[in-house]
Curated annotation (Swiss-Prot):
Subunit architecture: Part of the 30S ribosomal subunit. Contacts proteins S4 and S8.
Protein name according to UniProt: Small ribosomal subunit protein uS5
InterPro entries: Ribosomal_Su5_D2-typ_SF (IPR020568), Ribosomal_uS5 (IPR000851), Ribosomal_uS5_bac-type (IPR005712), Ribosomal_uS5_C (IPR005324), Ribosomal_uS5_N (IPR013810), Ribosomal_uS5_N_CS (IPR018192), Ribsml_uS5_D2-typ_fold_subgr (IPR014721)
UniProt entry keywords in alphabetical sequence: Ribonucleoprotein, Ribosomal protein, RNA-binding, rRNA-binding
Molecular-function GO term, any one: structural constituent of ribosome
Originating organism: Picosynechococcus sp. (strain ATCC 27264 / PCC 7002 / PR-6) (Agmenellum quadruplicatum)
Disulphide bonds in the chain: none
Amino acid sequence: MAKRRKSSKNKEKETNWQERVIQIRRVSKVVKGGKKLSFRAIVVIGNETGKVGVGVGKAGDVIGAVRKGVSDAKKHVVDVPLTKTNTITHRINGVAGGAKVMMRPAAPGTGVIAGGAVRTVLELAGVKNILAKQLGSSSPLNNARATVDALGNLRSFSSVAQERGVSIERIYA
């Protein structure tokens, strides 16, 4: 039993997951004796081949908060359908709280034109050519979640073709 657990952990580590911390913030809770300080970390994980997730961790120290954030992000991973030119398949908007993110596919060689947390999420998802704009809130957490929301709602060409009952070539035309 223990060997199986170890092998699953090794497989998890062998895969090419990268993690980036978007924000570390010191937060406080008012208790009877005064203020209790803790840290909140917003973490993005991705394998740069179409899987990405955002997580939040809170702990008494920074390392513990980041570890919890990575664990939370692994629970909220979404698959991103990418084209051959490493862009998204169609225009999409994402919303989380007061943040709204607009994304448009871009031609090869354009690069990732996005700012802040949105850029980090897109890079870890493996998107190489995209135009993105943050609207509304400037909160890194809400912008990251809005980006993941949009990426999770993307549909691949093959799924659309199957849904409509036509060949993929008809969709491209």
